Design a protein with these regions (language model features):
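C-terminal/domain-terminus segments
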Residues: 122-136, 142
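Flexible, glycine/small-residue-enriched loop-and-beta-strand segment within the central core
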Residues: 1-16, 22-121, 146-147, 151-155
């Protein structure tokens, strides 16, 4: 019986701000985490990701390359960020030229098990649990559904 190739990430080449909490196990590598952030267990944050100050990333979330998240955000449990839009009809298979960036501005809350495709989301947005964000969000408000649509403004 063959042995698999094993890769261990853990916490490698991460730039941490002040007063950051990481609950292990977590895979963080080549990313930047701002001041006063919280990273829950079973989170993966890949290289070149930037997390702004006072942002919370809850357990079982996946933040792939080419994602930036602003200040004072909440990423609830099980949120998935996607950087490969399958623009060629299938997976890019590591061809970074086919990947696209995701930009999350400040004060954005993303509900549990939401999926965020390569988009930009403006400040002061709430994304409902289980939502699938397929297009840029340019107006503050509450968004939910698949695909995510604006339900109402913020009060």
């Amino acid at each position: 019986m063959a042995e698999p190739r094993r890769h261990s990430a853990g916490i490698v080449d991460v730039t941490f701000g002040e007063r950051v909490t990481v609950v292990e196990p977590a895979n963080l590598y080549g990313c930047r985490i701002g001041d006063d952030c919280f990273i829950g267990p079973f989170v993966e944050i890949q290289r070149d990701v930037v997390i702004g100050p006072r942002t919370r990333i809850q357990s079982h979330s996946f933040v792939c390359e080419l994602v930036s998240i602003g200040a004072d955000c909440v990423v609830a449990h099980g949120v998935m960020f996607i950087n490969d839009p399958y623009s060629s009809g299938g997976p890019a298979r590591g061809d970074r030229t086919q990947w696209r960036a995701t930009r999350i501005a400040d004060r954005v809350s993303i509900g549990s098990n939401a999926t965020i495709l390569p988009v930009s989301i403006c400040s002061d947005v709430v994304i409902g649990a289980g939502a699938v964000v397929t297009r840029d969000i340019v107006e503050p408000g509450i968004y939910a559904g698949n695909p995510a649509r604006k339900k109402r403004g913020l009060k």
